[in-house]
């Protein structure tokens, strides 16, 4: 639900659009003082165009300028929840981290413990990877040794084969992150991705991803009901057509109430489904208590059987 593209002028490459939208959310949230920011990413702003940076400065001074605040807050919570999951996994002996649809993800560079202990594989479209690698070189002077950049078109290429070619170890304890990814993939691609993970991961491996219900994609009105703000209803209502015009249409959702059955059928167990109420309670307390979240956004993690 990467909701708005502020870029004008020359049309950007399709995969980079979503990547920059999410980097904008992380960068804007990181402008808040400690104790108020839901997530923190010191590198996110380095991936933003001048127009995004200008808007970020305006929105940081005047939060009322933030478009679709519920969606923004849910995306910030997603970053935080996934960060926390990775940190716990490091403490529990993580050996590999695979980030599918990595975009401008910066976990490999900002989460303590990954550089020294964990091999990271960042997988995304070749166009996005090219931009990403250039930015990383600008920030750090060179590409880090602990990260492998794997270029894949998920709809036309075998990501598993490409991953193996880059040194992925089938027997190692691995976490697979699919953040802001699966609703852009056709069902067949999602099934193939999960099948590879289930069959090619070491003991204790896990997946974590976010998803929306099928109804959120298929319906054209009344999507959010009364739980989301009016502006967020409009954001989700128009998101599919907006992203389709930019080359990234929504294609996949999971039937309501069926997430555990969906996951276990594909070779996973110990399913934990996280609702907007759950992450609102976990992260939006004190000064953040009145910040709205979007009720359509769900997170889920599970263990490989």
Predicted segments with their positions:
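Short loop/turn elements that flank and shape the SAM/SAH-binding pocket of Class I
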Residues: 155-158, 166
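Rossmann-like AdoMet
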Residues: 1-98, 104-150, 158
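Glycine-rich phosphate-binding loop signature in dinucleotide/nucleotide-binding domains
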Residues: 89-93, 166-172, 201
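Conserved beta-strand signature within the Rossmann-like core of class I S-adenosyl-L-methionine
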Residues: 175, 194, 199-216
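ATP-dependent adenylate-handling active sites, centered on carboxylate activation for C-N bond formation
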Residues: 111-114, 158-161, 171-173, 189-193, ...
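Rossmann-like AdoMet/SAM-dependent catalytic core
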Residues: 2-5, 44, 216-305
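A short, conserved alpha-helix within the catalytic core of class I
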Residues: 147-149, 158-161, 184-202
């Amino acid at each position: 639900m990467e909701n708005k593209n502020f870029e004008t002028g020359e049309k950007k490459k399709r995969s980079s659009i979503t990547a920059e939208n999410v980097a904008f959310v992380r960068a804007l949230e990181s402008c808040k003082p400690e104790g108020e920011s839901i997530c923190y990413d010191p590198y996110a702003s380095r991936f933003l165009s001048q127009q995004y940076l200008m808007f970020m400065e305006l929105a940081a001074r005047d939060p009322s300028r933030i478009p679709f605040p519920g969606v923004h807050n849910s995306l910030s919570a997603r970053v935080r929840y996934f960060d926390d999951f990775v940190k716990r996994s490091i403490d529990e002996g993580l050996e590999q981290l695979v980030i599918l649809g990595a975009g401008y993800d910066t976990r490999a560079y900002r989460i303590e413990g990954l550089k020294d202990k964990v091999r990271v594989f960042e997988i995304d479209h070749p166009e996005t990877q090219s931009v990403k690698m250039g930015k990383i070189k600008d920030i750090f002077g060179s590409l880090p040794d602990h990260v492998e950049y794997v270029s894949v078109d998920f709809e036309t290429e075998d990501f598993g084969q490409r991953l193996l070619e880059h040194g992925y170890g089938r027997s190692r304890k691995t976490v697979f992150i699919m953040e802001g990814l699966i609703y852009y993939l056709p069902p067949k691609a999602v099934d193939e991705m999960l099948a590879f993970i289930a069959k090619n991961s070491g003991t204790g491996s896990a997946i974590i991803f976010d998803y929306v219900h099928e109804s959120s994609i298929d319906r054209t009105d009344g999507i959010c009901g009364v739980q989301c703000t009016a502006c967020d209803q409009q954001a989700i209502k128009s998101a599919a057509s907006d992203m389709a015009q930019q080359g990234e249409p929504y294609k996949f959702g999971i039937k309501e109430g069926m997430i555990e059955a969906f996951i276990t059928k594909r070779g996973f167990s110990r399913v934990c489904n996280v609702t907007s109420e759950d992450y609102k309670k976990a992260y939006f307390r004190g000064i953040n208590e009145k910040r709205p979240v979007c009720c359509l956004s769900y997170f889920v993690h599970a263990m490989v059987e």
